[in-house]
């Protein structure tokens, strides 16, 4: 059982206190319904060695270490392999390098310099396995709550959390839509790699705004295309072999949408083309990756002939 009472205690006296009181029952209900692979993933978690880190680095990396023998490292590696595929990372856990599909540290290095997270209550929407949540704590956040309905990501988060004493990070295996309206309790909300999966992008922006305190900050990272304020790509069918991609606006269009949704001080802090070095298959993620989704003759296009993935980071205030 996952005990959320520390979360409820931590949020006493904040605008999130009432919501936090009901989270344990909500989580228990989700756990009861479960997932067909949960027992297998739980077995992998149970197989992790019982050790404590003497070194923890969440600021410059995601690294935990201590003196341990080769047998312990082998046990760690086997258990973590039982939680494949690993998509966001990398993680350096007691001598085991979890070489994830994404070099998420590269993205974080593009985002973090533009933020002051010290003492902030943070919501990470579509948090995946929690890689960025740990990096947010490393940057000084007071607390981080991540929501993502993917059970494997939830288990991967638990694998790291068990080695950190009283971390102020909590992964809730809920969709964003399960959060109550008008929470207005977070200082910063992140939506990274989520926006283009939304059928109603403006509704998503409004929902994100509703989670923020007045003056709070949104960090939005999403796929974009070149063009002016009226340029938006809506794929006919698939985009880079993904069926669930809906709207890819230009940066000026996205900034306009944010202003229309009531955000202010809207600024673009980074635009980067995703490379096959940043997203690729590894022994920890053996399925197809970006190189399989691009035109083999021209990496500036997807297999469908659309512009290859380019991502922007937009920061805005409520």
Swiss-Prot record:
Q: What is this protein called?
A: tRNA U34 carboxymethyltransferase
Q: Which residues bind carboxy-S-adenosyl-L-methionine?
A: 88, 102, 107, 126, 192, 196, 311
EC category: transferase
The reaction(s) annotated as catalysed by this protein in its Swiss-Prot or TrEMBL entry are: carboxy-S-adenosyl-L-methionine + 5-hydroxyuridine(34) in tRNA = 5-carboxymethoxyuridine(34) in tRNA + S-adenosyl-L-homocysteine + H(+)
Gene it is expressed from: cmoB
Q: Which SUPFAM superfamilies match?
A: S-adenosyl-L-methionine-dependent methyltransferases
What are its GO biological-process terms?
tRNA wobble uridine modification
The record's Gene3D superfamilies line, in alphabetical order, gives:
Vaccinia Virus protein VP39
> How does the record describe its quaternary structure?
Homotetramer.
Extract the CDD domains matched here: AdoMet_MTases (cd02440)
* UniProt-listed Enzyme Commission number(s): 2.5.1.-
Record-linked HAMAP family: tRNA_carboxymethyltr_CmoB (MF_01590)
């Amino acid at each position: 059982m996952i005990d959320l009472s520390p979360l409820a205690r931590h949020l006493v006296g904040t605008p999130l206190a009432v919501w936090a009181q009901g989270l344990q029952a909500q989580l228990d209900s989700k756990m009861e319904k479960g997932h067909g692979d949960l027992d297998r993933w739980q077995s992998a978690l149970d197989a992790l060695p019982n050790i404590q880190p003497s070194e923890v680095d969440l600021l410059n990396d995601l690294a935990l270490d201590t003196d341990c023998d080769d047998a312990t490292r082998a046990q760690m590696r086997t258990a973590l392999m039982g939680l494949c595929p690993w998509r966001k990372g990398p993680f350096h856990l007691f001598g085991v390098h979890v070489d994830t599909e994404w070099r998420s540290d590269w993205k974080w290095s593009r985002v973090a310099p533009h933020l002051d997270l010290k003492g902030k209550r943070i919501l990470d929407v579509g948090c995946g396995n929690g890689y960025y949540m740990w990096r947010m704590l490393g940057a000084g956040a007071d607390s981080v709550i991540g929501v993502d309905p993917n059970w494997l990501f939830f288990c991967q988060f638990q694998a790291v959390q068990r080695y950190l004493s009283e971390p102020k990070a909590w992964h809730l295996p809920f969709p964003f839509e399960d959060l109550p309206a008008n929470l207005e309790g977070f200082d910063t909300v992140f939506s990274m790699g989520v926006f283009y999966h939304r059928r109603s992008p403006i509704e998503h922006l409004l929902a994100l705004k509703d989670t923020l305190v007045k003056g709070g900050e949104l960090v939005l990272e999403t796929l974009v295309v070149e063009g002016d304020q009226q340029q938006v790509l809506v794929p006919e069918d698939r985009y880079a072999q993904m069926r669930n991609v809906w709207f890819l606006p230009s940066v000026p269009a996205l900034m306009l949408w944010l202003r229309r949704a009531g955000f202010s001080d809207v600024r673009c802090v980074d635009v980067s083309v995703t490379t096959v070095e940043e997203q690729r298959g590894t022994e920890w993620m053996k399925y197809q990756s970006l190189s399989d989704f691009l035109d083999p003759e021209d990496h500036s296009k997807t297999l469908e002939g659309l512009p290859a993935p380019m991502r922007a980071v937009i920061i805005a205030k409520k």
